């Protein structure tokens, strides 16, 4: 850079660039070398893109050792021996929205023509690894490093079950003399959780997320430690080869699979950008169903000759890009851990955190399940923690960022008495991880939660009886427990401030609540069973019981063995039912509801044909003429079983709009799939008769 060029950059801009470049390099060091980042991927991407934009505006700043021009951990010395890659191991450029994806596609297609074939691959959130095979035998494994030279981790890589020592020959794909293959090392979520649990048990700091744990495990000094950690690998590219020249990336993956190397079964070959966007949308919706974490979809031009024409920059190929989903993980401060008492008395610790945006919503609260889970995760009050929110799933605290501790953090101590009523807490039975408040009858927290639960959509579905109303009715003393709900009168509601106008008359909400309570007296029996707050009894078991017995008295008088024999019930739920009905005040609730006119038996419609007797039907997607509950009840009313998952025992799958993974499973197993019209015909006529031999 000449002095004239250097002088053209304003001093304040140069200072901004120097500070930003130094910050980015510090975070790269923590990520690639220490395996202990202190900011989220999204926060790093924002810093990196800010640096990139600054260099776009002032190209003079784009020097050779800028973080934007280097790959991964370039320039950092480590304790592992160096290993030179035979062909440069590049990174990927990222795009974060549809406009950026279209801009990338336009650049590609302007060079090679319209609507090429693309490969869409899951972007696994792990650590990159390069393997070299000579004459089919594993010679060396190396991390990415700076893209030219990485770290030799051969001994550790050999402990990974997915990495074969020798390649399997094939007539279609002879084993090449030289094969350099690239892939990603990662943890399955279940294995990551088991590893963290064992670390905490040994008094060691847990990993903050699966990516960090994969990097840390691959770079262990003792290969025996790596061997115990159940690392996995997926191959996603090739480097230098001798004796193998695939025409497409897709062909390369087929060969790798034949040779015994792991490739992702979800990879799709599509034509044109519209099909790419469809795959990105699909995995954006279904990524939480995978057994491992992904943070996006990698899009590649499939034709190898076209890849060569497009070439690469100093850090990434021009023929591939990573579409990154909004972050599902973020870092925030754990301000406190407080406990909540639920409707069955379970005492649950919750993490109260500085609100942070993650997976499209603001999160400030997450469950920690029980004291054992708090210990297993190794979190302290005051920690900076990693949190995850996957779709509509309740946010989860993954673990602490140990490097950011300053000594002010403190351990959480589970209370020994109920914070609501003062009753000593204890497990329901020996060995339970959860502790409970045994004062079920009069603990204020349990009363509130049970009254609120009665009105839930999965129970009696009483609009107007929310958490605020449940609290107000109990506080006013117009109900002692949920048994009094159906005896409520206008005078009772007038004594409750929430339902009284300033003029002293009943509010519109109060009138609606009384009307909705009357309507709730005529609901299906399974809803009544759910509303009683019997432990373990949810909608599925309740439906099975209602279908089998038809009325509450028969359920109450049935033996535990008889209840357990009902499909979908089993011994645990059966024991909970028997125990619940032996308690006097529980039976008093049933008697109060019965006395108030709540229907305790299903009225079987003799006109409804038993067309689905003995059949198992699964519904997936949205149906125009049925809600999900309506469809299930239609199946049950005709003698069928409405299952929640697809198996070889499933007789039919009904697929509406936007079906999920159940549809894919049905295709895989060859289960008959019906649209809504086919479903209506099945309900009316039953399955077609099998012709006699």
Swiss-Prot record:
Family note: Belongs to the NAD-dependent DNA ligase family. LigA subfamily.
Pfam families listed in its UniProt record: BRCT (PF00533), DNA_ligase_aden (PF01653), DNA_ligase_OB (PF03120), DNA_ligase_ZBD (PF03119), HHH_2 (PF12826), Nlig-Ia (PF22745)
EC number: 6.5.1.2
Protein name per UniProt: DNA ligase
NCBIfam families: dnlj, PRK07956.1
Lineage: Bacteria, Bacillati, Actinomycetota, Actinomycetes, Mycobacteriales
Domain BRCT: 607-693
Cofactor requirements of the protein: Mg(2+); Mn(2+)
Species of origin: Mycobacterium avium (strain 104)
């Amino acid at each position: 850079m000449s002095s004239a060029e250097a002088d053209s950059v304003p001093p304040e801009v140069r200072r901004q660039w120097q500070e930003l470049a130094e910050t980015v390099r510090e975070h790269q060091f923590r990520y690639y070398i220490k395996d202990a980042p202190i900011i989220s991927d999204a926060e790093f991407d924002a810093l990196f893109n800010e640096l990139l934009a600054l260099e776009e505006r002032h190209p003079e700043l784009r020097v050779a050792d800028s973080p934007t021009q280097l790959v991964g951990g370039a320039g950092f010395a480590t304790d592992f021996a160096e290993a030179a890659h035979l062909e440069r191991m590049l990174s990927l450029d990222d795009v974060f929205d549809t406009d950026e994806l279209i801009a990338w596609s336009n650049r590609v297609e302007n060079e090679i023509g319209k609507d090429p074939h693309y490969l869409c691959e899951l972007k696994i959130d792990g650590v990159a690894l390069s393997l070299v095979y000579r004459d089919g035998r594993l010679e060396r494994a190396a991390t990415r490093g700076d893209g030219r030279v990485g770290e030799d981790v051969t001994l550790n890589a050999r402990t990974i079950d997915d990495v074969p020592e020798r390649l399997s020959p094939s007539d279609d794909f002879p084993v090449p003399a030289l094969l350099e293959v690239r892939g990603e090392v990662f943890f399955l979520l279940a294995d990551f959780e088991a590893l963290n649990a064992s670390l905490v048990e040994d008094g060691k700091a847990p990993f903050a997320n699966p990516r960090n744990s994969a990097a840390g495990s691959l770079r262990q000094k003792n290969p025996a430690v790596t061997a115990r950690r159940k690392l996995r690998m997926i191959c996603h590219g090739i480097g230098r080869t001798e004796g193998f020249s695939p025409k497409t990336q897709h062909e390369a993956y087929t060969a790798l699979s034949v040779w015994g190397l792991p490739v992702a079964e979800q990879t799709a070959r599509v034509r044109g950008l519209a099909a790419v966007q469809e795959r990105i949308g699909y995995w954006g919706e279904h990524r939480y169903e995978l057994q491992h974490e992904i943070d996006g979809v990698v899009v590649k031009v499939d034709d190898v000759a076209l890849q060569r024409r497009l070439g690469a920059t100093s850090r990434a190929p021009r023929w591939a890009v990573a579409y990154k989903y909004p972050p599902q993980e973020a870092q925030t401060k754990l301000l406190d851990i407080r406990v909540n008492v639920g409707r069955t008395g379970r005492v649950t610790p919750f993490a109260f955190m500085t609100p942070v945006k993650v997976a499209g919503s603001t999160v400030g609260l997450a469950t920690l399940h029980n004291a054992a889970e708090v210990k297993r995760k190794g979190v302290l009050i005051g920690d900076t923690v990693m949190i995850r929110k996957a779709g509509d799933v309740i946010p989860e605290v993954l673990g602490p960022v140990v490097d950011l501790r300053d000594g002010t953090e403190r351990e959480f101590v589970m209370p020994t008495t109920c914070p609501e009523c003062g009753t000593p807490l204890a497990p329901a039975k020996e060995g339970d991880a959860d502790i409970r408040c045994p004062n079920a009858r009069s603990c204020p927290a349990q009363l509130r939660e049970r009254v609120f639960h009665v009105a839930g959509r999965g129970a009696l579905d009483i609009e107007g009886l929310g958490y605020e109303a449940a609290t107000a009715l109990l506080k006013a003393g117009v109900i002692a427990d949920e048994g009094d709900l159906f005896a409520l009168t206008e005078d009772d509601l007038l004594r409750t401030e929430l339902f009284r106008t300033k003029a002293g008359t009943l509010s519109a909400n109060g009138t609606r609540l009384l009307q909705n309570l009357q309507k709730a007296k005529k609901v299906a029996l399974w809803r009544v069973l759910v509303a009683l707050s019997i432990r373990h009894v949810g909608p599925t078991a309740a439906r099975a019981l209602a279908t089998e017995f038809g009325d509450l008295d028969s359920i109450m008088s049935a033996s535990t063995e008889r209840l357990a024999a009902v499909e979908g019930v089993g011994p645990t739920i059966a024991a909970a039912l028997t125990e619940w009905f032996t308690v006097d005040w529980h039976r008093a609730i049933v008697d109060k509801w019965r006395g108030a006119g709540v229907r305790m038996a299903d009225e079987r419609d003799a006109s409804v044909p038993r067309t689905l007797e003995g059949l198992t039907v699964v519904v997936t997607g949205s149906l125009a003429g049925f809600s999900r509950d309506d469809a299930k009840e239609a199946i049950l009313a005709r003698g069928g079983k409405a299952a929640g998952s697809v198996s070889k025992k499933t007789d039919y799958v009904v697929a509406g709009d936007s079906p999920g993974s159940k549809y894919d499973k049905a295709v895989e197993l060859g289960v008959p799939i019906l649209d809504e019209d086919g479903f209506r015909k099945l309900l009316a006529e039953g399955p077609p008769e099998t012709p006699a031999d």
